[in-house]
Amino acid sequence: MHKALPVMADTNPATLTMDPASIESRITERTRAIMPVHICGIPCDMDSINAIAKKHNLAVVEDACQAWLSQYKGRKCGTLGDLGCFSFQESKHLPAGEGGAITGNSDELLDRCESFHNCGRAFGSVQGKGYFMRGTNFRMKHYQAAILLAQFDKLQKETEHRWANADHLSAGLKQSPPWRKIISRKDRNVKP
C-alpha cells in the first residue's frame, strides 16, 4: 500500500529474537525503520537495536504482540522504541476478534498511525486538506473494545499461568537431548 518492503534480519539461536549483529548489513538508503519482534514473551536486545537505529536515524517499531507484561531492564515491551504494536487477534494474550493498539513516544508517528487507520484523514500534526495519505478503516468496534476491557483484569493471572506452564514444560524437556531451553525469564528481566 505504501511500497514498504520488509527486509529480514537473522535471529539469535539462543533467544529466537532479532540478532542485532545482523541488522547493519541490511540497512540501505531506503531503510526507514527497524521492527524487532519480542517473541514468546522474550524481549529483543533493545539497547543494541536502539543504538543501531540512532546511528542510522531510523525509527524503532516494536512488535510486542506476544510480549504483554514482559520487561526489558525494568521497562515494559512496547515502550522501548518509537512505537510499540500489540495485537488483539484471537491467538494473542488479549483476544478481541481482531484489531490492535499502538503505543509510542513520538506524537508525529502516533498521529500518522491515527491518520492511516482512519482512512488517511488528517489528524494532529498530520495536516492537509481532506485526506493526507492512503489509509484504511481499521477502527475497532465498540463491542470488541468491551470484550477486550473485560480481559484486562485477568491478564496478570493468565500471564503468570503461562510462565508456570513454560517452566513446567522446560523442566520436563530438560532430560531430552534434542531439546534445550531457549532462555529463562531471569536472563532478560522478563516478568509476567
Cite the ranges covered by each PLM segment.
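Active-site phosphate-binding strand-loop segment of PLP-dependent enzymes
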Residues: 14-96, 101-103, 108
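Structured binding elements
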Residues: 3
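Short beta->alpha connector loops at strand-helix junctions that form conserved
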Residues: 8-12
